[in-house]
Amino acid sequence: GNKKLSWRDDQQRFRDYLQKPLGKRKLSTITKSMLTRVLSDAERQGKSVGTVRQIRALASSLFTKAVDWGYLPASPATDLKVSGTSVSRDRFLQPDELARFFEAVVAEPNETVRDLVLLALLTGARRSNVCAMHWREIDLKAGVWKIKRTKNGEPQTITLSPEAVEILRARQAATANGFVFPGTGKTGHIAEPRKGFARILERAGIPHGRDTENGMVLHDLRRTLGSWQARTGASLAIIGKSLNHKSQQATAIYARLDLDPVRQSVNTATAAMF
């Protein structure tokens, strides 16, 4: 039931926010200001106020237990403040970056990274779901991907564009059963390819990383899909596909978007793809 779900969420939150900065420290050396820093870091990363409160609640219950069990005289997690002003991330690929980005993805020598990044972009799914994509969730004939459990605990059905189906067909030949992106770790599937994504962005001349000004992270691809659909009524699949046609058609679509920088760079991108 839900208990199991929240336990798993707590584990994930512990790993994501507490283990890295504090995992190697002795309990008795952890101070209130360290925990405050954990919360403000999460806010700076653009985590929602709800998520930051959940991290605070988790820290609070962990240290209360440590006091109950006699490991600590008092909890450093009492009265931790949440500012309530998370920096909302609204980074997505800009018109003038899109063509450079496609070009850089196509030039990526690691096929797995290339396919994963393109699928993240074309499906708008969460990176954790793309990494853990399983063949049994995918119906290529119907062009559908049924995710059993997403971050919010709900199942989700994603329509796969012809481009996404094409990428998956090519992968299917290599990894017919199990995970679409097998990995060597405990989970059996790939972990988020941070280095590979950074490589692609570097190649495209786009800043990367949460701590870099205007830097992109893999999760921003999810936002990119929504922003472009909202802005143009054209799906990214169509925009991406336009790069696959000789430049006349591609330029026509970009012209419809009425975005000058894209029109200039689209020819370079199309040239790179052929």
Task: Spell out what each predicted region is.
Residues 74, 136-144, 234-253, 264:
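Short, polar N-cap/turn motifs at the start of nucleic acid-interacting alpha helices
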Residues 67-75, 205-208, 274:
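Proline-centered turn/helix-capping motifs that create local helix->coil transitions or kinks
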Residues 1-15:
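Short, aromatic/basic-rich helix-turn unit that serves as a nucleic-acid recognition element
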Residues 60-63, 67, 258-262:
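C-terminal flanking helix
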Residues 28-41, 78-83:
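Short, conserved phosphate-binding/catalytic loop or strand-edge motifs used
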